[in-house]
Amino acid sequence: MGLFERYLTVWVGMAIVVGIIAGSFAPEIFVTVASLEYAHVNFVMAALIWLMIYPMMVQIDFSSIKDVGKNPKGLALTLVINWLIKPFTMALLGWLFFKILFAPWVDPQTAKEYIAGMILLGVAPCTAMVFVWSQLTKGDANYTLVQVSINDVIMIFAFAPIAGLLLGATDIHVPWDTLLLSVVLYVLVPLIAGVLTRKTLDKTDDHSTLNAFLKIMKPWSIVGLLATVVLLFGFQSETILSKPQAIILIAIPLLIQTYGIFALAYWLAKKFKLPHSEAAPASMIATSNFFELAVAVAISLFGLHSGAALATVVGVLVEVPVMLSLVWFANRTRHWFA
């Protein structure tokens, strides 16, 4: 894990502070950025999100899908949790906390937006950071690669229907044209671009050209994330300064969801008698979120100033320290799978 990944929470925290200060003292900058929009797509945010997502797609070798039959139990475990359990538990927790438990502190419209942001996080399984978590737990690299590749392909077809279903079920209006456009812009097109780039660059046996390209692009992916956080918290600065408790309220159900899903996945992996090299990455993949996609879709559907966008960024803030704690736990319990 590099310097940026290891201290990502610190960098995100600093970006949050910069965004809030800038939003308070130079709001005209954010008004200008917000005006650069067409068909619910903000050009500045779209460019930054592409900067985050495109390098991830280049990193993934989709030809690994041919090895899908080599780890059937681990793959089945993660796919079931990612697509049949996690989105629904996230929606349930969002509804429970913001419609009932936190109702005295959050107005109904804002509560809907927070729930929407949580749902978008729950429907987007993690992509790039999974390789880091797998490496830190000494996971099977081939299994991890196959699982991520399959998830990304499924995401093209399943993200919009599941997100639309859950948003509709929680009484949130779903602009389907914008949702489908978001999937095309932030999943399908970057995926195709990543595949073509990888095919063009990866023509040597030692992958030297591809590795050099990825080394150049990796820092820019983090820059895109941090710039996105600065902008989002700049747009949200007035709300956050007047209601700082909002971040804590959003973080609570996200923490419960993350630890709960990991516990379920890890327990099932033990029941299925998976080796630790599959159990650990399977549980990490099941637990973590593709927060870059969630942020992009939240902005497209609900706007830069929305509670949904804020909720997805809180997801970024929460995920890294939580996942590092789960890496520690997985490494300490390796003997459970002996």
Predicted regions: what they are:
Residues 1-58, 63-287, 291-338:
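Alpha-helical transmembrane segments of multi-pass small-molecule/ion transporters
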